[in-house]
Amino acid sequence: MFFIINDLKECISALKLKFDDQKELVKLVKNNSFNGFSSTIIFQLKSENHKKIADSIVEWFLKNKKDNYQNVFIANNNFINFQISYQKYLEYLIKTPCFTKKNIKILIESVSANPTGRIHLGHVRIAFFGDVLNNLAKLLGYTTVCEYWVNDYGQQARVFSFSVYQSLQLKKNIAIQQHPDGYSGIVIDKIASEIENFPVDNLNFEEFCKTSFLDHFLVNCTQKVLSLIKSDLNKIHVFIDSWKFESEIVKKTNFNDLLEQLKPNSYFYQDNALWLKTTLYGDDKDRVLIRSDKRASYFGTDVAYHLEKLQRGFDILFNVWGTDHEGHIKRMYCAFDALKNTTKTSLKIFALQLVTLYKNKELVRLSKRAGNVITIETMLSMISEDAARWFMLSQNNGTIIKIDLDIANLQNSANPVYYVQYAFARMNSILRIANSDQLKEITDCSLLINEKEISLLNQLVYYPFMLQKAMETGELHLLTNFLYETASLFHSWYKVCKINDDKNSLLSAQRLALLRSLQFIVKQILDVLKISTPQQM
């Protein structure tokens, strides 16, 4: 599809037309009246004579790009429709998609769950999203780093450590005064049992925070939780390249340098504490960077972290957050614009909604603070990783995921994961029994005239564009949508056409070439999603 966009831009330049290049120029269309690619470019042009302009665009295409198109015409709705030539389709059948290496570095901040417990169901969607975004960017030729931001500096980390300390106090029969936001449960008790020889006194939270051993104790607790978190992520095949600690950023950040970075834009002001003018970006109030006691706020350390990201020379920053951080997004964009000054680094924040599980139409409940969570082990006992990845990535980021476990565990076409995997296995089966002569490289594909075949050829043309769009926008559900649609088209094609026909070797060779290309891209997306690709089912 990129070649259609490029041809259209060349045409617009040749005809000296002006248009809004922020809008999508071309879309894949499948309906009863047309099966191909369509453009609304006419409505984006700064001209009142749409009909005349449309005629000139069609005339230019038919004169200058006839090798690429079987037909270019104006539809009743004034859209310009493109039917691809078989000569162009052939390119997609004899060459597998190849993505050139790009000199662009991407940092993906993902998971970043507070080190106050194990990974739970809500984190899994974020973990899968960051993992797949990382895989996709690598496939497209980008250099990537997937990073976990460890919040080990603030109040929450102290409360968690104190909860471990109180578990030790209880073991030694010391009366405790429970912190109102304290943690309890298996993780707290497990960490306490691993450091049970640590000496404890009758300390309340304020006294605990003033002890000389606080930093050492906090680091110890954090490392033990991170060990559990890494183990959890390994179980779902999510691997982090880099771990950045909030405490380390605070230690090495010269906040005077940070202020110098913000000064040129006059984004901050002093009023007892140091404030950033986040209201400029629609925030309901300005936010504190440095408190009156000179300690950095949670937001302040996050700003320092993003300055450090910029200093490492990344071109694109992707932050994968949960919607519990939604209020943080506007202020982060404000801070980033103030920080980056003349650099061209871009920041994109993806906020992912919650995940819920349903069994027998009833909600499976969870509660992290009470220690009663749906852990990785529990999740994997209820649903396969393949199904979990599919269902958590198959909807818009802002949609609450509601996984019906009864459907997710079905071994039939009602389960979309099974449906796609079965299509892949069936493709393999057909290719496996084809003889070598039938699988030779073809020089023509004009016998592929069935409507399903045209739709599948268009899928091949659309594929590279879809991948790039999914990566840039974070709309990873485009991947699962594409897979399901391709599988559906394939199953329909399989029913109406004999793909491997001994009585028509020429047609069979062309159909098998199409099948081989489809099998390649289906496997490529499943690999990006880290969903298994069974050879037979």
Curated annotation (Swiss-Prot):
Keywords for the protein's UniProt record, in alphabetical order: Aminoacyl-tRNA synthetase, ATP-binding, Cytoplasm, Ligase, Nucleotide-binding, Protein biosynthesis
Reactions listed under catalytic activity: tRNA(Arg) + L-arginine + ATP = L-arginyl-tRNA(Arg) + AMP + diphosphate
Residue positions of motif 'HIGH' region: 113-123
GO molecular-function terms, A-Z: arginine-tRNA ligase activity; ATP binding
One GO cellular component term: cytoplasm
UniProt subunit comment: Monomer.
Entries under HAMAP family matching the protein: Arg_tRNA_synth
Protein name: Arginine--tRNA ligase
Organism: Mycoplasma genitalium (strain ATCC 33530 / DSM 19775 / NCTC 10195 / G37) (Mycoplasmoides genitalium)
